Amino acid sequence: MAERTFGWVQEAYVIENLKRVVSLFVYNSEVNQELRWDKIPRLISKEYGRDIFIEELSKETIVLPYTHLKGKGTPAGYTRSDAPCSGIVQATLPGQRKEYQSDWPADSFLRWAVSIGFLNYDRDKDTCELSKLGLEYTLSKGGSQEEKDILTKALMSYPPACRILALLDTCGHMTKFELGAQLGFIGEAGFTSIPQPMIIQGLSETNSLKERGKLLQDTEGTSDKYVRTICSWLKQMGWVQQLEKEITIKIGNKEYTDRIGQAYQLTLLGKTILKYSTGSSKFKRIPKRILWDMLATKATDRDYLRNRRTHIINFLQNTYKTPEEVLTHLESKGIDESIETVIDDIQSFQNIGLTVSQQNKSYKIMDDIVGLQIPQDKSEQKLEKSSITLLKDQIRQCLKHVNHKYLVLLDLGFDGTSDRDYEFQTVELLTGELQFQGARLGDSRKPDVCVFYKQNGLIIDNKAYSKGYSLPIKQADEMYRYIEENTLRDRQLNPNEWWNIFDRNVNHFHFAFVSGSFSGNFKDRIQHIHMRSGIRGAAINSINLLLMAEDIKAGRLSYEDSFKLFDCNEEVIMG
C-alpha cells in the first residue's frame, strides 16, 4: 500500500491552479480537453505514459492512479529544471520557465485538493476521483459568489486554516514565525518553527541583501512553511492581509530591531468568516475535515501516533471527558499511555485547528469531524512505539515547568539532517524558556551556540547524529580553536569576532557538546581539549539538557551552579 501524507501542505499557492487540478477530473471540461488534445501529446512522451493518460482522461467517470497524477521525480542524467514531464498534474500546472511543473508541486496541489475535500482518495487502490464538493467547485464560475461560497466551505473545513485565523483574531498582527510556533503537534518532529529572535538578530547583523533575503525567505521551520502556504490562500480569499511588522528583541545588552515582511492581520471579512469555525446563530459551524495522515508526519512511529490520536478525537466528540477517562478508553484499544501524553495531545488538537472546550478538568471537541478513519490494515496491526516516543513519555512526566514543545530536541538530536533546527531549539530552550543570554551563531568559523549568565559563559557545539556522536578529532580541534580565539580575542585570528556575543563581565568559561547520545572515545577527546586549553567542559545529551532545564526552572538548580555541571570533563548525567 502506498504511503501518502495528506493534511499538511507546502508550496501550493494559487487557487486558480487548484481549480485547474480539480477540473481535469471532469470529462470534456476546458482543462480536460486541453490536456487530452494539446498538453499531454506535446509534453509527455509515450515512455512516461502519454497514451495511457489520454485514455484515462477520456472516460465519463475519471478515476486516476495517484502515481499517474503526480508523475515521477527527476530521472538520472537530468536536473530538476530540465526533468521531463511525467505526470498529468505536472502538465496541468504552469511552470515559471517551462510549460509544466515538477512532481513536487504536483504532489502539493494533490495534497491540497484532497485535504480540503475536493478530491476523494482511495487508500486501498491509491487513486483519486472528484468529490461532490469538487464537482460543484469545477462548475462554479470563476470569481462568482458561488465559487467563493464553495471555497469558504472547503477552506473552513481545513483545521490549520481555522487555527491561523483564530490566532490572528486573538493576537492581532503576527509574523509567520509567531504563527508557526503555535501550529502543529507539541514537541514533535515535523512541526518546527524558527525562533523569531534568531531571525531578527541575523537581519540586524548583516548589510548583505542576499543574506537578508536568505534569512527571510529560506530560513524556515516546517510549521513556518505551512503558515506561509496557508496565508497565501487566506490572502487570495480576502480574509487576511499581509503587512510588514517591526520587531524589537534584546540579546544580552544588545537591542535588535528589524522588520519581517511575512506578517499578517485579519481583515473584517476574515473576522466574519471565522464564525463558521466557532459557530453562531447566523453562521452554522462547518464540519472539520481531519485525515488520519495529518495526525503525525515525520515521527518514525507515526502510524502509532495517528491511531492513538484518532481514538482520542473520536472519544472526545460526544461529551466532556477527563484525561483519566481517555486513558481508560485507550486501554480498551490496547494503548498504554500517561496522563501527560493525553493532555499534550488534547492541547495539540487545538494547535492544529480543532475547537477544544474545557470545563474544569474535562475536555470536549466541539467540531463535527469528517474524513477521520483508521485504515483497515493499520487498525489490525499491533503498532509499537519507537524508542524516541518511549523516551519522550519518560521525560514528559518529569517536565512540570519546562514547555513540552522542547521534547522535539529528542527527535532532532538523532536526526542527522536537522543540525540547524537542533541548534535553534537548543538556544531557544536556554534563552527563551530559561534566562540565559546568548544566541545561535552557527555560521562558518563560529560556534553553534553561545550562552552566558552573569560571569559564566558556555561555548556549545550541537551535533545531531542518528547513532550517537563520537566526537571526531576534527570537531575536538575545532572546539579547541574556539576556546583559543575566545581567550586571545584577536581580530587577526578570526575577523568575525564571534566572542563579542558575551558581555564584557563574562570571564569564566566552559565548553559543551550537545547531541542525542554519545559513543566511542568522546570522553578522551573532552579530556584532551581540557589538557590543551585549561578550560573544563562536558558532553550532555538532549534528555539531560531537558532535565537540567527543568531543575533550573523549578528552582532546584541555580543558574550559577548549572555551569558547574560542565566541570566534569565527561558526560553530564542529571540526578
Give the role of each language-model region:
Residues 1-404:
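Donor-sugar nucleotide-binding helix/loop cap in glycosyltransferases
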Residues 378-575:
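Catalytic core segments in nucleotide and nucleic-acid processing enzymes
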